[in-house]
Amino acid sequence: MKITVQNKNAELAFDCGATESILYAGLRQGINLPFECATGTCGTCRARVMSGEVDVRWKEAPGGARLKPEKGDILMCQTRARSDCVLRVPSKLLILEKSRPARRQGTIRGLRRLTKDVAHFDLHLSAPMTFEAGQFVVLEAEGIPGGRAYSMVNFDTDVDKLALVLKRKPGGRFSDWMFDELKNEMGVEVFGPLGRAVFRPEEARNVVCIAGGSGIAGMMSILERAVRADHFRNHRGAVFFGVRTLADAFYLAQLSRYTEASHGNLEVTLALSDEVAATPLHAEFTALKLESGMVHEVAARVLAARERDFLTYIAGPPVMVDSTVRSLIAGGTVIRDIRYDKFG
């Protein structure tokens, strides 16, 4: 099928297969369609069907709460075309210049628990992938409706294995499926890479990373990229990792290694929302600082007296992301220096 997308100033067209979402079809062909989560959660990929027939796969998607289906509103990530279609979108239409996302097969291996409700796993790919630090992929499993977005923990080019973090969520069918049976050697569909909240050393900026829970995954990729590029030789960095209690924190050894490789220019603070920090430093990983409070509040306190000369990356639950953005802007950070991909 042919899909034509329009806004007030431009029109672009692309082909769409019968079994793929309109969003994925456009992205893999280099059309920069609007999206954030790509899984039905955020609502950013909304469009209006002006002509043609479509099939909405997940009518109850949270991101569709404000749509007007009677006027033809859809989420492109949850919609397949049944004929040639014309869609109206509210954002600019551009051709992607960087690597385009594609569909691959993946095999889950090395699944291991990090905490009571967080696990790490490796995803072995059927074809190599090149991605930027901070990007994510969407996984789909047979028999489980919809896709789930996961940020890469690792960083490299032309890789055939991704490191990912899984957070168990109440009522989450995919996370329950993974946790209950520890699905090693299981196959999944993979679409990516996706995401615009990326780190590029050539921008030559100081960096702040603020993450809640499993949101630390993408920050680990950013830190890996920065350390490999020796970014912290000439630039400062600060990481704020929010968890409920110290027992909920993970990747601490790796975070400690990043501080050791930073020429003294990277600081890492664990923000404990449900526990009083007994000491100012972690007992085992003494390079890591401890603070009590919500992660966005801890970050605001620490950054209050600092010059706003940094790029800030945010990842975590949508409520946490929204609170952090408001806090940063109130503290004087300009919106163009805040980067995040909102999914959760």
Predicted regions and their residues:
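Reductase modules of NAD(P)H-dependent flavoproteins
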Residues: 1-79, 85, 237-344
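Short, surface-exposed secondary-structure boundary micro-motifs
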Residues: 50-53, 92, 142, 193
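Short, structured interface segments
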Residues: 74-97, 186
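Ferredoxin-reductase
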Residues: 100-187, 205, 243-245, 271-275
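Short, conserved phosphate/pyrophosphate- and ester-handling motifs at nucleotide-, phospho-/glycolipid
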Residues: 134, 215, 317
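A short, basic/flexible loop-to-alpha-helix module at the beginning of a structural domain
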Residues: 192-203
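Histidine-anchored nucleotide/phosphate-binding helix
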Residues: 220-230
